[in-house]
Each structure stands twice: as structure tokens, then as C-alpha cells.
Amino acid sequence: MIKVGIVGGTGYTGVELLRLLAQHPQAEVAVITSRSEAGVAVADMYPNLRGHYDGLAFSVPDSKALAACDVVFFATPHGVAHALAGELLAAGTKVIDLSADFRLQDAAEWGKWYGQPHGAPELLKDAVYGLPEVNREKIRQARLIAVPGCYPTATQLGFLPLLEAGLADPSRLIADCKSGVSGAGRGAAVGSLFCEAGESMKAYAVKGHRHLPEISQGLRLAAGKDIGLTFVPHLTPMIRGIHATLYANVVDTSVDLQALFEKRYADEPFVDVMPAGSHPETRSVRGANVCRIAVHRPQGGDLVVVLSVIDNLVKGASGQAVQNLNILFGLDERMGLSHAGLLP
């Protein structure tokens, strides 16, 4: 059994990680930390986990207890993993970080977007960006894995086939993305209140969202050149889900884009390229570690529209983290993640 530690288990990504690991036949959660909830039983805080984690309680973070684990997940706000990851890595413990702390390769760029100096720039050379569809082989050898964000996952998976094949004009990419309210986290905030978010939709961070440099970094690597991306996120009145509508101009209209996408993702267990003409729905991936994609070329012109949907808490966070765990420890990549989405 893989001995697992979790730092920060009281947010939505933390409880989702617990839910997924409860169904994992090769993982055992030995330590879960929370300074604010130390001493509280996991099953008391999350009744949906009763019968799965009886006897496990939140504890104050203890470096020795965490270092005794085979792998530690960080489901924390940005900056926390900076302070603890180095000590764990030195002890031989693997680290899978769900925060943004190690996603960007440039420490100065990270500081610009997150409003504070990067706390562990010396570790960036060891960090592997945990998008399995791109970095599977690097993940196998990793010590420190940076799990991609939710918007970056849906957007990159939608654009990758076009950019890798050199078919899209990389200077004019548009990502029009919608997210459920759980993407804002569990903390109390006026914008997340039911009366504020219900029956309404709005764009936000149009000037620049923290996920913009992460998406741009991945797309630039895929294209092999600089890219121009307009990324506009929206808050929608649903709990879970990301719907990304992606626009690109293709340079060769003779290419069969459906075949291109199907070939690119033919061997990917968690990317579903839907039949031509499909319109994937967020409800089809709720609770599942799947990205569903459809590609369109309206009126047969040179503008391509890619529709990409994920559950922001699963393929956009905790499910992708478990997928990385499986790859890292040489397990079947689908282990503990084969459940279907929830309907209705």
C-alpha cells in the first residue's frame, strides 16, 4: 500500500481527494492536516466519508509524520507548499501539489501573478507539470509534481492537437471559459453566496487571470513558438464544471480535424473525443476524471471551435492528482478513477 499524507484537507479539493482515495485499492491515507480543525475526525466533518476514514482525524502539520509517508498531496492555498516541500523531498517523500506553487517555470513570473516572491525557486528545476497527456514519461520519474489548474487543463487539452500539428495560428487564440462556483474555493466570499451567484452569470478577471500565464506556458511549449491568447473566465450558477469554448484560425482547411483529434487522444484513458457535431455538457463529466472534447468548423471556414468540458474538482484538480499518483508509482493509470459521471 502507498502511504499517503494530505496537507490541507478541509477545502473542496481536499475532500474530493479523500473521496477518490477512499476508492483506491493501493492507497492508504495515514496523515491529514489542518491547523484550524486539528483533532476533528474526518468522518465528522464529512459525513459522506463515514465508513471510509473512521479513526482518521485532522492533525497539526508535523514534518516527521508527513516525511514518513510515501507521497504527500498539498491541497492548500498558494505559498504553503513552498515552505514544506523541500524538507519532504530531502527525506525522500514524493510531493504532488494541487496548488499553483510549482506550475510556472519562471519564479519572477509567478511572483508577478501571485503577489509575493516565490518561496522555493530552487525547487522549480525539479517540478514536473502534471498534465499526463503531455508529460507522462516525465511524471514517472518525478519527485515533485505540479498538478495543473482547472481552466488550464480544459484549455490545453482542447488546443493541443491543433498547435502540435502546426495547424492553428498561434498568435490569435481565444479561450472563453465558464466555471462552477466550487472553483472559487470553500472560503466565505460574497460573490459565492447563493443569492449572488444563483440565476446569474458574469465574466471576471478579464484584464488578466492567474491561470493565464500557466495556459500560455503550456500552449507555447506545444506550439514551439510564442502564442497570443485571450482568456476570459466566467462564473456560472452551477457547483461543479468547466466549459471551455476555444477559438483558433487554421492555416490549412483541408485537414480532417475530427481525425486529428481522435488520433491524438486515441490512447488517452481520460480524454473522450466525441463524434463530429457533438456538444459536450458539463453534467456528463460531473464526478468523473474525464475531459470530453468536440471540434467544429462552422460553415466550413477557417475558424475552428473546440468545446472542452471537465469537472473542475476531478480532472481539473483531485482526480488528475490521483492520475499522477498512479503514473508515479507504476500503477494502472485508471486505478481508482474508472467511475462514470453522475446523472442527472
UniProtKB/Swiss-Prot annotation:
- UniProtKB keywords: Amino-acid biosynthesis, Arginine biosynthesis, Cytoplasm, NADP, Oxidoreductase
Q: Where in the cell is it found?
A: Cytoplasm
**CDD domains documented for this protein:** AGPR_1_C (cd23934), AGPR_1_N (cd17895)
Q: Where is the active site?
A: C150
Gene Ontology terms for molecular function? N-acetyl-gamma-glutamyl-phosphate reductase activity; NAD binding; NADP+ binding
Q: Which SMART domains match?
A: Semialdhyde_dh (SM00859)
Catalytic activity annotated for this protein? N-acetyl-L-glutamate 5-semialdehyde + phosphate + NADP(+) = N-acetyl-L-glutamyl 5-phosphate + NADPH + H(+)
Which SUPFAM superfamilies has this protein been placed in?
A: Glyceraldehyde-3-phosphate dehydrogenase-like, C-terminal domain, NAD(P)-binding Rossmann-fold domains
* Entry EC number(s): 1.2.1.38
Principal location: cytoplasm
**Pathway listed:** Amino-acid biosynthesis; L-arginine biosynthesis; N(2)-acetyl-L-ornithine from L-glutamate: step 3/4
A single GO cellular-component term from the record reads: cytoplasm
GO BP of this protein: L-arginine biosynthetic process
Entry keyword Amino-acid biosynthesis: yes
- What function does the entry list? Catalyzes the NADPH-dependent reduction of N-acetyl-5-glutamyl phosphate to yield N-acetyl-L-glutamate 5-semialdehyde.
**NCBIfam families listed in its UniProt record:** argC
What family does this belong to? Belongs to the NAGSA dehydrogenase family. Type 1 subfamily.
Q: What is this protein called?
A: N-acetyl-gamma-glutamyl-phosphate reductase
Q: Organism, per UniProt?
A: Pseudomonas putida (strain GB-1)
Q: Which gene encodes it?
A: argC
